Swiss-Prot record:
It comes from Populus alba (White poplar). Coiled coil: none annotated. One of its GO terms (cellular component) is chloroplast thylakoid membrane. This is NAD(P)H-quinone oxidoreductase subunit 4L, chloroplastic. It is a multi-pass membrane protein. InterPro entries: NADH_UbQ_OxRdtase_chain4L/K (IPR001133), NUOK/Mnh_C1-like (IPR039428). NCBIfam families: PRK05715.1-2 (NF004320), PRK05715.1-4 (NF004322).
Amino acid sequence: MMLEYVLGLSAYLFSIGIYGLITSRNMVRALMCLELILNAVNLNFVTFSDFFDSRQLKGNILSIFVISIAAAEAAIGPAIVSSIYRNRKSIRINQLNLLNK
């Protein structure tokens, strides 16, 4: 019974992240929504790893790998956003065309 609740929470987080990623015009908000999506995926990895075979740690190891990738994205993403803001004076996604200049 606990599996359904965790999967429902994960689906809810994933849906919020996808909705925010599709509708956001701000790059910082898009990065935050991407983090929500990655956290929902991590929750699924850990849940299914524990539910199907709690002796093996494959889901947990994969989750740690995704967390490290998300940490790198969280470090590099704002640096790219600040660089774009310095050059273009805007971080709105629909106003950026990096191939123009």
